[in-house]
Amino acid sequence: MSYAADVKKELTGLRVHDGNAKAELSALMRMNGVSTLGIDQTVSVKTENAAIARRIYTLLKQNYTQIEVEVTVAEHNYMSQHKSYGVLLKNKVSDVLTDLGVDPFGLHPDIPDRILNQVDKRRSFLRGAFLAAGSVNSPEKANYHLEIFTTHEELAETLRLMMAEFGLPAKIIDRSGGYVIYIKRAEKIVDFLSTIGATQTMLRFEDIRMMRDMRNSVNRMTNAELANIQKTADAANKQVQQILFIANEIGDLDLLPKKLRDIAKARLEHPDDSLAELGDRLEISKSGANHRMRKLKALEDMINAGVTYDLNKL
């Protein structure tokens, strides 16, 4: 089961009172409901999630009396294991939709104030919208992403504003004949899941994200340390080669001034030391050790260039 499916499974197990249940149903009906007009008017809510189908059925039966509701199941084809579910409301369709603030003709997209006039109702509406057409990437993946899809531009903007009320800065893009409201920042995805009541899967998201970020941080630190070690080793090896070259050219390192002689011999004796470590051995600073090495490098350059030099003036 995917992470998104786990989130929806948790949401379908939440208990809600009547006002919040109707706000959730309103979103589900708006986003996934299909009305059939005529004498035998019906409305069917489609989903590929059995738990969501049961949720819709239960909320309808709990909030409306004397309604006829049935759940239908359809297989995509005989080779497929995927099924789709429909929750079919067979009577009192107009009464139920009116109570939920849903226009069966889709001519009035506005949501009545009574559906969203409390904070918990707005949370429930967002929950219904996510159950109907939402998805979220697993926190194991590199790209954090949560989205809700709708074919109605007005509803997309309503959802965006509703999310902003909860401190969730969502964006909207056009996609395949509809609109996607999405969040990319991991901490805001966590906040969204908390807002709609997915507490357990939210905590799981946070745990996985923190472990993943920690591993990445450790890897970055390790890579940086390895790079520094390699850089130090390369520099030390180059200095050893310079000192050996100078010793061969002048005949004896003892001919060097004391400060340069000390650093040269220390480097040959401790080829793996960093400049800071060499400085500690000679009781000088890292910058002092670096200054002396630069003088040895200058001497090497003069020898290579055939320039006359005076060891006593180095």
Curated annotation (Swiss-Prot):
Chain segments annotated as transmembrane: none
Residues in coiled coil: none
Gene Ontology biological process: cell division; regulation of sporulation
Signal peptide: none
The keyword NAD belongs to this UniProt entry's keyword annotation: no
Pfam family, one: LAGLIDADG_WhiA
Ranges of the DNA-binding region feature: 274-305
Keywords, alphabetical: Cell cycle, Cell division, DNA-binding
Highest taxon above the source species: Bacteria
Keyword Cell cycle: yes
Gene Ontology MF terms: DNA binding; endonuclease activity
Functional description taken from the UniProt entry: Involved in cell division and chromosome segregation.
NCBIfam families: DNA_bind_WhiA
HAMAP family registered for this protein in UniProt: HTH_type_WhiA
Family: Belongs to the WhiA family.
Protein name as annotated: Probable cell division protein WhiA
